[in-house]
């Protein structure tokens, strides 16, 4: 094909680490050749990831979101392929509001 594959599965669950968390939600995100998948904002999430060069750690917290300090950790995992390179990513957030405040749409599922 003319494009490198970008197909990801993102999961979210409550707990401290992916090793011990049961995924409560899972969505798919395909970004090539066009944006698709069960991610609720696939088009925007693909554009956001392209802007970040596929680097999930580059998705930083937005200043316009106020979250409580409540500690109810959630773990997000991302596995699959981004522009032909294997991806395996895990990040723990203090609570779901904090998770949703990183980046714009990638983690909001």
Swiss-Prot record:
Annotated site residue numbers, Reactive bond: 69-70
One GO CC term on file: extracellular region
Disulfide bonds: 31-46, 67-97
GO MF annotations, alphabetized: serine-type endopeptidase inhibitor activity
UniProt entry keywords in alphabetical sequence: Disulfide bond, Protease inhibitor, Secreted, Serine protease inhibitor
Parts forming coiled coils: none
Pfam families, A to Z: SSI
Keyword Secreted on entry: yes
InterPro entries with a match to the protein in the record: Prot_inh_I16_SSI (IPR000691), Prot_inh_SSI_I16_CS (IPR020054), Subtilisin_inhibitor (IPR023549), Subtilisin_inhibitor-like_sf (IPR036819)
Taxonomy, superkingdom: Bacteria
Localization per Swiss-Prot or TrEMBL: Secreted
Biological function: Inhibits plasmin, trypsin, subtilisin, and other microbial alkaline proteases.
Protein family membership: Belongs to the protease inhibitor I16 (SSI) family.
Description of how the protein assembles with itself and partners: Homodimer.
Protein name as annotated: Plasminostreptin
Source species: Streptomyces antifibrinolyticus
């Amino acid at each position: 094909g003319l494009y490198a594959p970008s197909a990801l599965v993102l999961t979210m669950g409550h707990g401290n680490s992916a090793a011990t968390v049961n995924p409560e939600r899972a969505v798919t995100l395909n970004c090539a050749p066009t944006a698709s998948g069960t991610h609720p904002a696939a088009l925007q999430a693909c554009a956001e990831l392209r802007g970040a060069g596929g680097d999930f750690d580059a998705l930083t917290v937005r200043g316009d979101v106020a979250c409580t300090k409540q500690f109810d950790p959630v773990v997000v995992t991302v596995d699959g392929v981004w522009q032909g390179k294997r991806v395996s990513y895990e990040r723990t957030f203090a609570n779901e509001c904090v998770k949703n405040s990183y980046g714009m749409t990638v983690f909001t599922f």
